[in-house]
Design a protein with these regions (language model features):
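Conserved helicase motor core of SF1/SF2 NTP-dependent helicases
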Residues: 5-32, 36-146, 150-235
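Pre-ATPase regulatory/linker segments immediately N-terminal to the P-loop/RecA-like helicase/translocase core
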Residues: 1-3
Length: 235
């Protein structure tokens, strides 16, 4: 049964989205991600495979299709370093700005300018906040992007998934090689959660797993070489 949930968004203007030279693997991802029966996609891949870019692109397309009202970008506030920076001065927005930069960068790349990205934020068509703010919320008609999910616990991922209401679509993105949390298993909660939802029953409920490999790295040939070398080394 196809999802017929349609957003009555008072903002009628279409978003002009830059079209990039997508690979066949990326087009395959779009076919799954944008399918009306798809609800959740666990996306695995090393650095440089454009996981955030592709999910953001899908969110923008879904807004143009009037299937969602807005994009919500979430991350766990975990630093990508073995040493914490400790207390940082400033407002909550100031402190979270650096965690949100990957999403803002992808928005600007797809929209063509910082001004156009800011306009979407002003119209409340995009929002960004940490995972621990999600509890108690109910998300209907939204595209949820949980980025760097290898740094999320099972409880955090469960919290995000169980916020989903009618008409929402969720992308859970992770690179298990880049786990920065110390208090859970080596790969955080993502690997366990994605395995739980990798069966036929999950597919019947619109829950998919999609994997990019080092062969799909687009950032640079150097990064592709580095990731391939690290994979072979077993480090």
């Amino acid at each position: 049964i196809q999802n017929e949930f349609v957003i009555e968004n008072p903002i009628k203007r279409l978003i002009k989205i830059n079209q990039l030279p997508w690979t066949e693997k990326q087009k395959e991802f779009f076919r799954i991600a944008l399918h009306p029966d798809t609800n959740i996609v666990f996306v695995t891949g090393p650095a440089g495979t454009a996981k955030t870019l592709l999910s953001t692109y899908c969110g923008l397309q879904l807004m143009n299709m009037k299937l969602i009202s807005d994009i919500m970008y979430l991350r766990s506030a975990v630093e990508s370093s073995d040493q914490s920076l400790g207390f940082l001065p400033g407002t909550a927005d100031d402190k979270l700005k650096f965690f949100n930069m990957p999403f803002v960068d992808k928005l600007e790349e797809l929209l063509g300018s910082e001004k156009r990205a800011e306009k979407l934020s002003e119209e409340k068509r995009v929002s960004m906040f940490p995972v621990n703010f999600a509890r108690g919320m109910n998300w209907s008609g939204k595209c949820i992007i949980l980025d760097e999910a290898q740094n999320s616990t099972i409880k955090e991922i469960t919290t995000v998934l169980t916020r989903m209401g009618k008409g929402s679509k969720c992308f859970i993105l992770a690179d298990p090689m880049q786990t920065d949390i110390r208090h859970e298993a080596k790969h955080g909660g993502f690997v366990k959660m994605s395995k739980v939802f990798s069966d036929e029953e999950s597919l019947e409920h619109g829950v998919y797993n999609f994997e990019f490999t080092h062969e799909d790295i687009m950032r640079s040939e150097l990064v592709k070489f580095l990731i391939g070398k690290l994979n072979k080394s077993g480090l």
